[in-house]
Swiss-Prot record:
Its cofactor is Zn(2+). It catalyses: 5-methyltetrahydropteroyltri-L-glutamate + L-homocysteine = tetrahydropteroyltri-L-glutamate + L-methionine. This is 5-methyltetrahydropteroyltriglutamate--homocysteine methyltransferase. InterPro entries: Cbl-indep_Met_Synth_N, Cobalamin-indep_Met_synthase, Met_Synth_C/arc, UROD/MetE-like_sf. NCBIfam families: met_syn_B12ind, PRK05222.1. Binds 1 zinc ion per subunit. The active site is at 699 (proton donor).
Amino acid sequence: MTIVTNLGFPRIGARRELKRALESHWRGETDATQLQHTARELRARHWRLQRDAGVDLPPSNDFSLYDHVLDTAFLFDAIPQRYRGLVDADPLAGYFAMARGRQADNIDLHALEMTKWFDTNYHYLVPELHRDQHFALRGNKPIAEFEEALALGITTRPVLLGPVSFLLLSKTVDGSNRLDLLERLLPVYTQLLRQLQESGAEWVQIDEPTLVLDLDAQTQQAFRKAYAILNQGPRPKLLLTSYFGPLGDNLELALQLPADGLHIDLVRGTEQLDAVLNTLPAGRVLSAGLVNGRNIWRTDLDNALTMARYAQGHVGADRLWLAPSCSLLHVPVDLEQEKNLDADVRNWLAFAKQKLSELRVLADALDNKPEAETALTQTRQALEARRQSPKVHRPDVAQRLAALTPDTTRRNTAYPQRSQAQQHTLNLPAYPTTTIGSFPQTLEVREARAQFKSGKLSESDYEAFLKAETERCVRTQEEIGLDVLVHGEFERNDMVEYFGEQLDGFIFTKLGWVQSYGSRCVKPPIIYGDVVRPAPMTVTWSAYAQSLTDKPMKGMLTGPVTMLQWSFVRDDQERAQTCRQIALALRDEVQDLEKAGIKVIQIDEPAIREGLPLRRGEWADYLNWAVESFRIASSNVHDTTQIHTHMCYSEFNDIIEAVAALDADVISIETSRSRMELLDAFVKFRYPNAIGPGVYDIHSPRVPQEEEMVLLLKKARAVLPPEQLWVNPDCGLKTRGWKETRAALQTMVHAAQRLRAE
């Protein structure tokens, strides 16, 4: 019988139970025991769901209260000194302090840096290491969760982040080489593997996703060294797991490593199948990632079955496992909850639970079970209906794309001329202050939105409520002394969803939540067809906010690349083409904002770097169409209109030329968690336009001191001319409270005033 396995399951719960449990605990409403009870219930539910879906070997230790990379650092005692006292006194509080920071009980701790998990929209906490790092086992989470499942009668395969990937995903605070710590780390892995074997684990999934990256000779040698040592001690069988792309030139390396099985991504790396089959060592299991773990479209089961049969013919039925391409962390839990979704589109989709069923169908078809044919036929019909649907293809969009010319992507004049025109119009002081866009979405705001959507609040009453919140926001910014204001975005539930709801070609789920980080969940739109803007989307609220103040008001848009990256994107055409469609829709919106008297327009692109292909050789093509799309959206304005963009969680050193090519008048970037490290890019590259390096971290509730911000601004001033510098937070303030927001922004304005006075 063909084995069905899974690499990871969504943690948050079908109805975001984990989010609610975490936030209740952080507010002090529940204790650690209650939080852990919810966690155990979720794990049990998910293991049973996978078992009932026909998964023969589900994972364990894929669950986390916040982040699996943080879990790994915590497990191996890679805890920075500043957290030691709290961790020793209260491990769970210390764990959350590492994730979120802590400012209470005379404790003032920064959180660990956060960054994107490869090219996904999931964020992980970056472990901090140093040359004298000591590793030791702290707790027994992987063993405890394996035994927890076993007590339910379910045998699982524990998941570990592999030692080399763990080090490569970390940072050293003293500039030392991360891989030099391998010899210190491996004994702890060896100890853990031995304990897992003693607990009865037959297999361990050891994730080394960095195997799909460009690796230098030193890193390749680190892999060889690591697995040679892990192979010496008693251990369970190891499933070496790669995902997010083909192994490419690391295939030979992966096959040299002494593992008992190899998982490959056959969705993003279809082309690697022949090479793997021709070189897979005798006796080694092949886990074939045939179902897309990152997107929500139904699998072409005929195509997947063809690959599976081909693989089975080479390795034999007993050595072939069927799996998703990667962990299902990146997709919603269950499509069955979406009762009100357009029936046609719904029939084209598969969420985590349905993807497991697809794998079972493939396994049954491989085993020649007749019941598989019904599901195969249903899938064929759904895919054909999608190909033929008029909901997907619009001739007017194709015509507009064909009419694009180089002039579509150019401003009227170069930045030096535009900046003079803008300063004449806006009359801003040195070190102008602004925010990134959103202001706190309080419980009252969320409740009013929910009441409006459920019909309990009339449209006129809801609009009156939003106007009052917007005016409060504008008055608060004026009182604080900010120079360029925003309207607060109280009408918006999400920076992508808000726009997608107003664009043809997008559709939204009700419960299609996925984890972004910690308790932060997002509900990505689904781009199922050609994108068109039927009517203005933001003009009414921006114009209203501008009518309340004489100060410049920023129009706030989400950029085309970010809308693409943060959506589930159609897989029947190139991503670049979909991005250009979104850009044209935004171009129309930008023009309407300018006509309405909005002189500053921000087009956020926080996701531009995460769209980079994992292999550097593929970067140029992506950056070309990403930059082109931004310029399509932003170039149809007068010189006096100032175009801003915002980017967060980004490293710019290697894409600084592309960032400059966007030709935004002002960019704001996330820099505070990295203590302005991102500005290193500007030492070698003379960035031509204005820039606002974020001076405080909005992902943490702590209010920074004025001196901290002044120091960061002085660091920025050492790299950039003062006339190019803006002063702003790292990101939007949606998730913060009003009290801390007001205090932090007041401190920020005072910091800017100090620099002006020097």
